[in-house]
From Swiss-Prot:
GO terms for cellular component: ribonucleoprotein complex; ribosome. GO terms for molecular function: rRNA binding; structural constituent of ribosome. Keywords: Ribonucleoprotein, Ribosomal protein, RNA-binding, rRNA-binding. SMART domains: KOW. Part of the 50S ribosomal subunit. NCBIfam families: rplX_bact. It comes from the Bacteria. Belongs to the universal ribosomal protein uL24 family. It holds the Pfam family KOW. One of two assembly initiator proteins, it binds directly to the 5'-end of the 23S rRNA, where it nucleates assembly of the 50S subunit. One of the proteins that surrounds the polypeptide exit tunnel on the outside of the subunit. The gene is rplX. This is Large ribosomal subunit protein uL24. GO terms for biological process: translation. The lineage of its organism: Bacteria, Pseudomonadati, Pseudomonadota, Gammaproteobacteria, Pseudomonadales.
Length: 104
């Protein structure tokens, strides 16, 4: 079970975007995440009239390592860590500081 999943709200704790918040768009296999509006890079694309792609400089989100982000706890308005607890025979994610369920 992963500590950070798609659609989780996270806060960046290290790097050029430190302090920014965003939603996880994609979780990649090698502990990397794509977060909306964070870690933007510019890509130069060639025009391709066959597929209708207009050329130019396109800004897009690049993957960042999961160690540079922390899950955002809305109750405390701070970054938090994730732990696991078994309730009713199911393993759930909980915030370490408040012991409340992440997916609640």
């Amino acid at each position: 079970m992963q500590k950070i999943r798609r659609d989780d709200e996270i806060i960046v704790i290290a790097g050029k975007d430190k302090g920014k918040r965003g939603k996880v768009l994609k979780v990649l296999a090698d502990d990397r995440l794509v977060v909306g509006g964070i870690n933007l890079v510019k890509r130069h694309t060639k025009p391709n009239p066959m597929s209708g792609v207009q050329g130019g400089i396109v800004e897009k989100e690049a993957p960042m390592h999961a160690s540079n982000v922390a899950i955002f706890n809305g109750a405390t308005n701070k970054a938090d860590r994730v732990g696991f607890k078994v309730e009713d025979g199911k393993k759930i994610r909980v915030f370490k500081s408040t012991q409340k369920a992440v997916d609640a």
